[in-house]
Structures are given as C-alpha cells and as structure tokens.
A protein has these predicted regions:
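Charged catalytic and DNA/RNA-contacting regions of genome-maintenance
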Residues: 2-292
C-alpha cells in the first residue's frame, strides 16, 4: 500500500488498515499522552485524543468509518502544541523514521519525544523571558527531597529537609513556579493535597514509577550522567532524599526527550531552611518567578 495515501482516505475504506493498526500499537504505549501521529504533511489525532484535543486547538472534529479524527499541518504544529501544553496536556510526537519512498508497506514510525509543560523548551509557551522549571518531589516520613531543572538554561538544583513539617515544603517548591511536578506514584494523593491547599492544582502532575526514586537507582543515574564516581563533589554524598529526587527527575527527562541532556552538566545543592534553593539575586536575574 502506497505511503502517499493519507490516513484520512484510508480510513474511508477500512478502520482496520495496517496503518491504523500501527497507530493503535504506538498509542498503547502512550496512554497518558495525546498522540501526534505524523502522516504526509499533517499530524493526525484519533479516537478520544481527537475529541479531547480538537476543542483545545480550536479545530474541527471529523470522522471516517466512525473514527473521530482531527489534524493540523506539520509546519504549524508549534502553534497547536502550545495550546495543548498551556492547558497542561502531555503530547507524544510520532514521526516517520524511514524514507517513505523506500518503505515496503506501511512506513515505520516511532515516538521521538514526549512534550510536557515542564520539558517543552522548543516552544515559547508564555514568553521568552521566563524559565521553564520542572520539579521532582520525594516524600518520606523523615522529611523530603526536592529537585528542580530548567531545561532552557540547564540549571539543576536539589535540596532536602529532615523536617517532618510538610507546611515548609510548598514554600520551597513554589518559589520557582514549576509548570510540572514529578513524584512517586504512591504519593499521588499526598501531592495533590499539597498542591490543592496552595491553589496550584493546575500544575501538571506526573506520577513516576516508585522504583525510579530508589536511592541506588537515582545515584547511578546521576553518576552516569555527570560521569563521576561519587556525588561528593556536588555535596550530595550524604543527601539521600535529594539524590532520590534528582536522579528520578533525570530519568524522567531522558525517557521523555530521548536525548543526552548534555546542557545539564552539574547539580547544585542547597540545604533547606538555612540556604534558599534559589537565592534572591538568581531569581531576579533569571526572572524565575512570575509576576503575580
């Protein structure tokens, strides 16, 4: 079957075409994201994704063979992606990964990256002068660990507190107005309570596998990324909770973006309660906090 026949036309013939089967296989691995499926000169969306995205992107919802669908031109994709990300959606970008002219049957496709409000440095969501922070939160009975990354600048910071007073946590977390927060799946209810109590429920909440916050796992990820044998040079040698938060955040970003994140070349540690995660001069100079 020729790759030049667009899926809209194929869907007229049969909703179980090889290309639709390919779409469904890929979508199965990205149930928590809207899938932008590249076909010819468009990104297509189908089924519930189309129903959800079409009103947000302000485009028409159509259907073929009872399959809801909508599409946007690939050259204008940033405009529509921006609308979705500003509303807190996660979007998986699926591209052709082989030359259509050389393909036998359906062209191979794969998700090349997943965009979220905290990771979409390719897009200017709310202006070029604002940093785009993503946070990672690790809660324990004995305290908490926090990590922050701005992918635009490569700045990465981590902190932890042994205080069991969770009221201290939101102040540290909201100093930089993160667009997204990553946390262990088992802590989802607690994190939602924290965000709700401070009117920050609109922040994209991204639960992550609990094992990603395991200290040994997180430590290995950080040492591998920074190419060091010890985290002592970053003052993280005995900061288990900060390491867990930071390592899990790097793991999450590498999984979504599928790149080396080479811009992130160090992590700075700040002791909560005695030293601000971001000092006042840094906040002012880098404009890390929105004017309310």
């Amino acid at each position: 079957m020729s790759e030049y026949i667009c899926l809209r036309d194929m869907a007229k013939k049969n909703s179980s075409t090889p290309m639709m089967e390919q779409y469904l296989r890929i979508k199965k691995d990205y149930q928590d994201a809207l899938l932008f499926f590249r076909l010819c000169d468009f990104y297509e969306m189908f089924y519930e994704d189309a129903k959800i995205a079409s009103p947000v992107m302000e485009i028409a919802l159509t259907s073929r063979q009872k399959i809801p669908m909508c599409g946007v031109p690939y050259h204008a994709a940033d405009l529509y992606l921006g609308k979705l990300l500003r509303r807190g959606f996660k979007v998986a970008i699926c591209e052709q990964v082989e030359d259509a002219k050389l393909a036998r049957g359906v062209v191979k496709r794969d998700v090349i990256k997943v965009l979220t409000p905290g990771t979409a440095i390719e897009l200017e969501l709310e202006g070029a002068n604002e940093s785009n922070y993503i946070a990672s939160l690790f809660l324990k009975d004995k305290g908490w660990g926090l990590a922050l990354i701005d992918l635009a600048s490569g700045q990465m910071r981590a902190a932890q507190s042994d205080s069991q007073d969770k009221r201290v946590l939101p102040d540290e977390l909201f100093k930089v107005s993160p667009r997204e927060i990553v946390f262990p799946e088992e802590e989802e209810k607690h994190v939602i309570e924290i965000l709700s109590s401070h009117n920050r429920i609109s922040i994209l909440k991204s639960p992550l596998e609990d094992w990603a916050f395991d200290y040994s796992q997180a430590k290995n990820i950080l040492e591998g990324h920074f190419k060091v044998k010890s985290l002592a040079g970053f003052d993280l040698a005995d900061k288990d909770m900060a390491v867990s938060a930071a390592g899990a955040l790097l793991y999450y970003l590498k999984k979504l973006r599928k790149d080396s994140l080479s811009l992130i070349d160090k992590v700075s540690y700040a002791q909560s309660g005695t030293e601000m995660i971001l000092d006042a001069a840094t906040i002012k100079n880098l404009e890390l906090v929105k004017n309310l």
